[in-house]
Amino acid sequence: MGEKSVQKKKFILETARKVFVEKGFKKVTMKDIVEACQISRGGLYLYFDSTSQIFLEVLKLESEEADDVFSGSIREDATSADILILFLQEQKKELLRKENTLTQAIYEYYFEFHPTKKDNILKIQFDSAVKIMEMLIQTGVESGEFYCEDCKGMARNIMFVLEGLKISAQTIGITAETVDREIAYILKSLDA
């Protein structure tokens, strides 16, 4: 794919993201994306076959960008505790963000399509986050920053708490105080 095609595809994905944020997943059609991008229907189908394919590409792009932002925020001399606190603070920002979020669209997509474990990007991201969190906690235990007898169990628990907070943010609403309380509980559990 040439540079012009790469840029066009990225433009479509960035524009489609805005459409998914506004309408969720279920209500978005290829026509909506064509109109938002101001391109021909054929021009869109040159790159994508369906709204599902576009949505999954939007999620991948979003994940890559979030990883880049987080990685760029970590100091060279950061300790395991510093990294964990930075990660939890980034999660807090995301949880409290009221606008420009794909959370509703993500849940609509997964409730509608029930992807298998193999192609479920949320499951893949969750499992990857658990592994990274487990390594981070293990490193913190080895350096004496944390105390934890079951690093994998703690990592899984942290990710389930964050996922529960995401759902709560979309359904019943949460406050900064609620998120701070949960973060404090996580840190206390590690004696951080």
Where are these regions (language model features)?
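N-terminal intrinsically disordered/low-complexity leader segments
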Residues: 1-7
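Hydrophobic/aromatic residues within well-ordered alpha-helical segments
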Residues: 8, 51, 58, 62-66, ...
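Hydrophobic alpha-helical connector segments
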Residues: 57, 61, 71-98, 154-158, ...
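C-terminal peripheral helix-coil segments that are non-catalytic and often amphipathic
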Residues: 86, 90-93, 131-142, 161, ...
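Amphipathic alpha-helical packing segments from all-alpha helical-bundle domains
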Residues: 64-67, 116-142, 156
